[in-house]
């Protein structure tokens, strides 16, 4: 009675008498699930990322405004915002410990997270949608990509450093280095953020096996 299956299972969960909803399904579904939970008056843990495309993000922002009006608790899955040491670190930076911040370079270099299985693993009765949802990480509509689904933590820290003000511009390049005809996500992306004060944030994201691994943040100030 407490287990629900299917693409509409979220409705049954919300209507089952719960007080809090934890949204951790593939992020392509997050805007729809968030909207339904807010409209039902539920408190929510909203895992990152909140969406995989611009329409989804706009929907999430609208739902967030409604949640505020209803007085609902919404906690986002950007874990570093709740890390005491990291919070103290960013506070000291904001207080001028290294002078005026000029640049942040963030790296998110790892191996593949959920490699796409071979086509032979697909059962005959599975539709294209079921196959893609089962392998959601490898399809942009359902999982975003390595930048959206994983390195968004680094994007969040860059935003945090610069006062959560949106950048003036963001220029990116990327592609697929490995020969792989399954799925459609890129395996490497580089982004250059320019902020209003002239400071820049750089983000390097890559998920290729057998390469150097690193998840670091380098911040440079005037001191």
Question: What does each of the following model-derived ranges do?
Answer:
Residues 192-197, 221-222:
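Active-site beta-strand termini and strand-to-loop segments that position acidic
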Residues 27, 31-82, 96:
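Beta-strand-loop-alpha-helix segment that lines the small-molecule cofactor/substrate pocket
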């Amino acid at each position: 009675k407490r287990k629900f299956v299917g693409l509409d299972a979220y409705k049954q969960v919300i209507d089952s008498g719960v007080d809090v909803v934890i949204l951790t399904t593939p992020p392509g579904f997050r805007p729809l699930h968030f909207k339904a939970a807010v409209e039902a008056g539920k408190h929510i843990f909203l895992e990152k990322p909140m969406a995989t495309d611009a329409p989804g993000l706009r929907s999430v922002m609208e739902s967030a405004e409604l949640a505020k009006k209803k007085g609902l608790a919404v906690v986002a899955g950007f874990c570093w915002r709740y890390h005491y040491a990291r919070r103290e670190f960013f506070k000291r930076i904001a207080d001028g410990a290294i002078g005026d911040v000029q640049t942040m370079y963030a790296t998110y270099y790892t191996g593949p997270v959920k490699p796409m299985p071979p086509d032979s693993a697909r059962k005959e009765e599975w539709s294209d949608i079921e196959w893609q949802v089962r392998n959601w990480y490898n399809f942009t509509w359902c999982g975003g990509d390595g930048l959206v689904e994983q390195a968004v933590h680094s994007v969040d820290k860059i935003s945090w450093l610069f006062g959560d003000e949106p950048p003036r511009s963001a220029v990116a390049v990327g592609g697929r280095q490995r020969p792989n005809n399954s799925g459609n996500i890129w395996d490497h992306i580089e982004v250059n953020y320019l902020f209003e004060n002239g400071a820049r944030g750089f983000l390097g994201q890559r998920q290729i096996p057998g390469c150097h691994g690193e998840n670091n943040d380098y911040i440079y100030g005037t001191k």
